[in-house]
Amino acid sequence: MRFSRLISALLVSACFSSSFVRPLYAADNIAIKSFPIAQFKVGSDEADFGSFRFMGGLELTSENDLVGAISGIRFFANRQDFIGVTDTGLWYKGQLLRDQNDSPSAVTDFQMAPIQNKNGMSSGSKWEFDAEGIALKGDKVFVSF
């Protein structure tokens, strides 16, 4: 049963590549407040975990009810621009700003838009567009549901 679900997810992902879906049509900017997270573990300055280093994080809030339920995020090569999907059938994009130590400091130019099928239709039904993950390959965007 798990294997058939995986195959179904992969097929759906292939159908929703950027050649069929245009996620980044014009959308209004959404105000995002960013609060830096300086420590991985409260009360500890430990930043190295094996070969990984915690560079910082952000707590993001917004007065816009659409913001939330983030399922996946991917950064482009410039490490600033990002794109992602939500559990509620939305795309989002924005830019991550970094401080002088290269730690995340804020999110700007944040926009959201409905995920659309190959016919340009979005859905008000969560189960049809409940995105769980996102991957980039060249100019294609793959979404898992």
Kindly label every feature range from the protein language model.
Residues R2-R5, C15-F145:
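Sequence/structural signature of beta-propeller domains
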